[in-house]
């Protein structure tokens, strides 16, 4: 599969099954097969989670940042295998060493940098970092498992 960068949201949807309001990636900006992927998400006040988290102090929920990091990891795995195959999914399988270093608010641009650490029998282990303005907001080790359904 020839990967042309950047990969925009409409084409990300051809790679991963997530859709609004759960698709958390806006663009893939860098990719090295079986190694690294960089993606971005523009955080806007129009996103549904900000109606309740929190109305007077909107803060991006940490679990959604982790989900976005997992989507980036799954996208790295799928692109590394040449694209999405029918009935094949990469599921979020685990998380270790998660640390939340700064709040993410509407107007921020999240930059996700994910690196494949190991891949064995359909399970990938990734180092994932989410940054805002070059500062680490969230970091974690994420596992994704491939499954045919």
UniProtKB/Swiss-Prot annotation:
Subcellular locations according to the entry: Cytoplasm
Active site: 53
Family matches, as NCBIfam families: fabZ, PRK00006.1
Biological processes annotated in GO: fatty acid biosynthetic process; lipid A biosynthetic process
Protein name: 3-hydroxyacyl-[acyl-carrier-protein] dehydratase FabZ
One Pfam family here: FabA
Keywords for this protein: Cytoplasm, Lipid A biosynthesis, Lipid biosynthesis, Lipid metabolism, Lyase
Gene Ontology CC, one term: cytoplasm
Lineage: Bacteria, Pseudomonadati, Pseudomonadota, Betaproteobacteria, Neisseriales
GO MF term list: (3R)-hydroxyacyl-[acyl-carrier-protein] dehydratase activity
Chaperone is among the record's keywords: no
InterPro entries: FabA_FabZ, FabZ, HotDog_dom_sf
Organism of this sequence: Neisseria gonorrhoeae (strain ATCC 700825 / FA 1090)
């Amino acid at each position: 599969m020839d990967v042309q960068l950047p990969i925009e949201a409409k084409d990300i949807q051809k790679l991963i099954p997530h859709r609004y309001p759960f698709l958390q990636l806006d663009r893939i900006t860098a990719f090295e097969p079986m190694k690294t992927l960089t993606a971005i998400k523009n955080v806007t006040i129009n996103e549904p989670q900000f109606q309740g988290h929190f109305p007077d102090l909107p803060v991006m929920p940490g679990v959604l940042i982790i989900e976005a990091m997992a989507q980036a990891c799954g996208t790295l795995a799928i692109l590394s295998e040449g694209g999405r195959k029918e009935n094949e999914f990469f599921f979020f399988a685990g998380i270790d060493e998660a640390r939340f270093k700064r709040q993410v608010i509407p107007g921020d641009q999240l930059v996700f940098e994910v690196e494949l650490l190991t891949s064995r029998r359909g399970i990938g282990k990734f180092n994932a970092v989410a940054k805002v303005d070059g500062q680490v907001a969230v970091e974690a080790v994420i596992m994704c498992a491939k499954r045919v359904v």
